[in-house]
């Protein structure tokens, strides 16, 4: 069993590709890609359980009380915040559907291309996290580089 957080020996890479890295494994891979200054990141997330366990918002409770809807909202928020963190770190990020839903419901691709221009979205990220009561692993990993 391996863990990308333990992977060393590479200083810089051109492209990082992740496919269905479960839950926070995607976050560890994205943080590693940012640390390596990857020129391109292509990430197809899998399950997004972390924020499903955390998300709380009194105004959204009438919707969040339904498990299926909470799961879907949590998945979308997770991937949206991932894209925002990548933009903060100097990437142009897009979220795309890469295959028809009839083939798999896990059809979201986060595509990020390094621009070197750091985003000015830190406050927006923090407000979103605070409003939803979430603390994504990717944010922590990027804010504490070298501590993992």
Model feature map: region roles:
Residues 1-148:
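Class I S-adenosyl-L-methionine
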């Amino acid at each position: 069993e391996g863990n990308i957080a333990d992977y060393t020996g590479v200083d810089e890479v051109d492209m990082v590709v992740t496919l269905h890295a479960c839950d926070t494994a995607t976050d560890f891979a994205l943080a590693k890609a940012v640390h390596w200054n990857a020129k391109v990141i292509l990430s197809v997330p899998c399950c997004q359980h972390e924020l499903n366990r955390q998300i709380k918002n009194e105004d959204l409770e009438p919707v969040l009380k339904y498990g299926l809807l909470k799961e879907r909202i949590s998945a979308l928020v997770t991937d949206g915040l991932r894209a925002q963190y990548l933009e903060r770190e100097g990437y142009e990020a897009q979220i795309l559907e890469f295959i028809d839903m009839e083939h798999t419901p896990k059809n979201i691709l986060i595509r990020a291309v390094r621009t070197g221009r750091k985003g000015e979205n830190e406050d927006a990220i923090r407000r979103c996290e605070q409003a939803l009561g979430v603390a994504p692993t990717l944010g922590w990993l990027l804010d504490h580089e070298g501590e993992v």
